[in-house]
């Protein structure tokens, strides 16, 4: 699959901010189109927001902040129920 994609819709997202509201990590459940495929797909996007805007860089986050980000995404219903059930099985 080509890396070039266009976000059609952000369905839900969880966010964790640090160093003020301008810097945040997000997990988004979104519908996207890839440039080499004409079908919309629902995906999870892990994003870094710098200065309030999506940064074109890797999201690098320490484990404690990741737990806070994951909790925010969970509380915001980013994950489908079947995904939550699969995660519960992994964590047992």
Regions found by a protein language model. Give the residues of each.
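Negatively charged, low-complexity tracts enriched in Asp/Glu with abundant Ser/Thr
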Residues: 1-25
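Compositionally biased, intrinsically disordered low-complexity segments
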Residues: 11-14, 30, 35, 64, ...
